[in-house]
Design a protein with these regions (language model features):
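Generic detector of low-complexity/intrinsically disordered segments
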Residues: 28, 44, 73, 92-93, ...
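Short beta-strand edge/turn micro-motifs at domain boundaries
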Residues: 101-135
Length: 141
């Protein structure tokens, strides 16, 4: 997905994050996320849920191991703000037709190996119904 005015390296990195994560490819995800990565979810009730990298990976592992279908790869880069070795990307993201769209904020950090996700924030898409950003599980873990 090419977005005018965005560093092609960041655009390519975001595409990898979406496609590798959507496939529950934990080995691939290991290379894309910093060791101290955090995940914040703003609920439709205004509460913030903070998850560690390990908690997010555990959820994706459980979904993969239970045979859940891959997540949808629907996304659109809305804006990227780059400041030296840091960048913030705002994305429209929809994980499944069974889950509402969300606004994704990716906090990126550039290191010797290139870009990595240092944090993510997920908020309800304006005007969308609240709910989990992941689709409901169809299989037990």
């Amino acid at each position: 997905m090419s977005t005018p005015g965005i560093d092609p390296a960041i655009a390519d990195f975001i595409a990898k994050v979406v496609h590798i994560g959507s496939a529950y490819d934990l080995d691939g995800m290991e290379r894309l996320y910093t060791a101290d990565q955090t995940f914040l979810i703003l609920t439709s009730e205004g509460e913030v849920i903070r998850l560690t990298r390990a908690q997010v990976f555990d959820e994706f592992r459980a979904r993969r191991d239970a045979g859940e279908p891959p997540l949808a790869t629907e996304y659109r880069v809305l804006h990227v703000e780059e400041q030296g070795q840091d960048a913030v990307a705002l994305l429209y993201r929809r994980m499944s037709p069974a889950a509402p769209p969300v606004l994704y904020e990716l906090r990126l950090r550039k290191g010797p190996g290139g870009w990595a996700v240092a944090g993510e924030t997920v908020t309800p898409w304006p005007g969308a119904e609240g709910g989990s950003f992941l689709p409901p599980r169809t299989r037990a873990a």
